[in-house]
Amino acid sequence: MALPKIEDVRNLSDADLAEKIAEAKRELFDLRFQRATRQLEKPHLFKHTKHRLAQLLTVERERQ
């Protein structure tokens, strides 16, 4: 899974952006749960998800 380009994130509508933020937060929660129970098979996904969430939140903040 490649990290998303910031240009792709900036082209999202406000509704899509909010949906993607909620999705990334849910995925991060699931990854934390898997890590705590030692079921996480791909630890790099944790970093990718945090990075994607940071991009989404940055773009949301830029629009305010």
Swiss-Prot record:
InterPro entries: Ribosomal_protein_uL29 (IPR050063), Ribosomal_uL29 (IPR001854), Ribosomal_uL29_CS (IPR018254), Ribosomal_uL29_sf (IPR036049)
Keyword Calcium: no
SUPFAM superfamilies membership: Ribosomal protein L29 (L29p)
Alphabetic keyword roster: Ribonucleoprotein, Ribosomal protein
Molecular function GO terms recorded: structural constituent of ribosome
Biological process according to GO: translation
Keyword Ribosomal protein: yes
GO CC field: cytosolic large ribosomal subunit
Protein family membership: Belongs to the universal ribosomal protein uL29 family.
Protein name in UniProt: Large ribosomal subunit protein uL29
Organism: Synechococcus elongatus (strain ATCC 33912 / PCC 7942 / FACHB-805) (Anacystis nidulans R2)
